[in-house]
Amino acid sequence: MAAPEVSSAGPNMLHPNSRTLTLRGKRGHAAEDSSQGAVSDCKKMHSSLNKVTACYRQLVLCVGGTSDCTRLREELEESRKKAFDLSTDLSNTLMVLLMNEGVSQEDRVELERIWVLFLSTLEFFQQDLCKAHHLCQLFPLHGRRKRLVNTGVIGKTSEVAYRARNIKSPSSSRMHENQQRTERPCSPDLAGQIEHMERMLHDMQMKVSIPIWTVEATEEAWAEVASTCDLDECSDNEILAGEDITSRGCCAHGQSLPGPLCMVS
């Protein structure tokens, strides 16, 4: 007669190899989540940089015009410093991620796309810096020898500067580490920042070589035009309404003038 089987009441123990595989799987998922979070932060930071540089470009158009003043020069300085901080943080973060071999292929493709767009943004921003430097030399506020040009730009520039100040900068632990590691203050001199921007573009292209023609677009053309703006929408609507009323002439103000005079005005 066969002996009865005795079941062990002890707990089920995992094999050491299976435990190692479990730990590796958890670490892999954690690294993947961290990489995806860094890519998302880079997207947000590049979007913020685009908005700040766009506001800076609008402010540069007013230099030397009838709306030029000390306040405009201060707003240019504030927008320039904010764009400098965003571009420096994004450049350091992208270089660290692109030189990391542990980044997945999907995230690397997205990082390369952000990298190419970022280079284009920096080139446009550098052109605006050169334009602002040239106009500020032509039309100095103190000891002015030349009269301001009637460029047709009227109204205040505070709305544009307000939008630039309210643009939020995405922050993460990785970006703070890179900022502390390579912290460089913004040059108070406009010519100094132009030189710094040239060095930044040169270093980026030398350290990370990404052929532009290998990067494919993932969005439709002019998709940003149809997108909704989440910054100061009420202020933008008021500005557009004010421009619409101004463009209508005397008829919008309830003045009853003859037809020919109204057309001339």
From Swiss-Prot:
Residues 70-92 form a coiled coil. Residues 174-186 have a biased composition (Basic and acidic residues). One of its GO terms (biological process) is negative regulation of signal transduction. Residues 1-37, 168-187 are annotated as: Disordered. This is Regulator of G-protein signaling 9-binding protein. Keywords: Coiled coil, Signal transduction inhibitor. Regulator of G protein-coupled receptor (GPCR) signaling. Probably acts by regulating the activity of some 'R7' family protein (RGS6, RGS7, RGS9 and/or RGS11). InterPro entries: RGS7BP/RGS9BP. PANTHER family: R-SEVEN BINDING PROTEIN (R7BP) HOMOLOG. Belongs to the RGS7BP/RGS9BP family.
